[in-house]
UniProtKB/Swiss-Prot annotation:
Belongs to the HesB/IscA family. This is Uncharacterized protein SAR1364. It comes from Staphylococcus aureus (strain MRSA252). It comes from the Bacteria.
Amino acid sequence: MQIELTDAAVTWFKNELELPENNKVLVFFVRYGGEFQLKQGFSPAFTVEPKEDVDIGYEQQYDDLNVVIAEKDLWYFEDDHIIVNVVDHEDEISYSKK
């Protein structure tokens, strides 16, 4: 399992979500529905949470941006390499599978 953020995505998260912030982490989680589906009926989403509120199952650092996935959501991301990027003309986050 790997979550790969492009440089553009790291910059987008820092600017849009005002990260890094003291003890806050970028959390990827599973949601019902959505366009990009690794497993049928579910898609990735993200939020910002205090690090102590997340039961971390996966953690990776990009510059000073701390990216985590909770233990309960690992089932969705396991066995996949996901690339998180920015769609330039829409200024939105996009996902693809490597």
